From Swiss-Prot:
GO MF terms held by the record: D-tyrosyl-tRNA(Tyr) deacylase activity; Gly-tRNA(Ala) deacylase activity; Ser(Gly)-tRNA(Ala) hydrolase activity; tRNA binding
The organism's taxonomic lineage, starting at the top: Bacteria, Pseudomonadati, Pseudomonadota, Alphaproteobacteria, Rhodobacterales
Record-level GO cellular component terms: cytoplasm
Protein name: D-aminoacyl-tRNA deacylase
GO BP: D-amino acid catabolic process
The family this protein is said to belong to: Belongs to the DTD family.
EC number annotated for this UniProt entry: 3.1.1.96
The reaction(s) this protein catalyses: glycyl-tRNA(Ala) + H2O = tRNA(Ala) + glycine + H(+); a D-aminoacyl-tRNA + H2O = a tRNA + a D-alpha-amino acid + H(+)
NCBIfam families named among the record's database cross-references: D-aminoacyl-tRNA deacylase
Keywords for the protein's UniProt record, in alphabetical order: Cytoplasm, Hydrolase, RNA-binding, tRNA-binding
Subcellular location: Cytoplasm
Length: 148
């Protein structure tokens, strides 16, 4: 699985002009399932993200994780994280997981975060979504479970 994390002071996602998910302080997580990903992959990624110390402590150092700050996660599916731009000018997306499997893993990932006591809001899988955010820092991280 691939994830692009942004530390935010606020974020929301809308479909057809209606806000379907919103958080204040926390992480906006764009997520993409890749071929070969499993429920175990999802659980490991959720655990890793929940432990990442990317929030400032009283000394201003990135030393706190999401739960320690009382933050939430907004999880948005984004198959374009699987883009292959190595040839031509049009990205290829054949490296993304098949839609039915990807949707199941997207939903599993949100559930895995909830099981770790992280409040979670989500987008709508496969929908044309408008995502708004106020990046805090900015802090943006790329995680790929294929990297270990």
């Amino acid at each position: 699985m691939r994830a692009l994390l942004q530390r935010v002071s606020s974020a929301s996602v809308a479909v057809d002009g209606n806000t379907i998910g919103a958080i204040d302080h926390g992480l906006l997580i764009f997520i993409c399932a890749m071929p070969g990903d499993t429920k175990d992959t999802s659980a490991r990624l959720a655990a890793k993200i929940s432990r990442l110390r990317v929030f400032k402590d009283d000394a201003g150092k990135m030393n706190l994780n999401l739960a320690q700050t009382g933050g939430a996660a907004l999880v948005v599916s984004q198959f374009t994280l699987a883009a292959d731009t190595s040839r031509g000018n049009r990205p290829g997306f054949s490296g993304a997981g098949k839609p039915a499997e990807a949707q199941a893993l997207y939903e599993q990932f949100a559930q895995d975060l909830r099981a770790l006591d992280i409040p979670v809001q989500t987008g709508q899988f496969g929908a044309d979504m408008q995502v708004s955010l106020c990046n805090d820092g900015p802090v943006t991280l790329w995680l790929d479970t294929a990297d270990g």
